[in-house]
Structures are given as C-alpha cells and as structure tokens.
C-alpha cells in the first residue's frame, strides 16, 4: 500500500532521482 510517509519520501526523493 501506499503509506503517507512512504509516499512523502518516495515523492520528494523519487522525483529528484528520476529528474
């Protein structure tokens, strides 16, 4: 599932990693 914490971490760090 998608957890709020996880989403926040993967959302910020994820976009930086992909970008």
From Swiss-Prot:
EC number(s) on file: 1.1.1.37
Superkingdom of this protein's organism: Bacteria
A GO term for molecular function: L-malate dehydrogenase (NAD+) activity
Keywords: NAD, Oxidoreductase, Tricarboxylic acid cycle
Signal peptide start-end: none
Its job: Catalyzes the reversible oxidation of malate to oxaloacetate.
The name this protein goes by in its record: Malate dehydrogenase
UniProt organism field: Delftia acidovorans (Pseudomonas acidovorans)
């Amino acid at each position: 599932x998608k957890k709020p914490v996880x989403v926040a971490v993967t959302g910020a760090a994820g976009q930086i990693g992909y970008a």
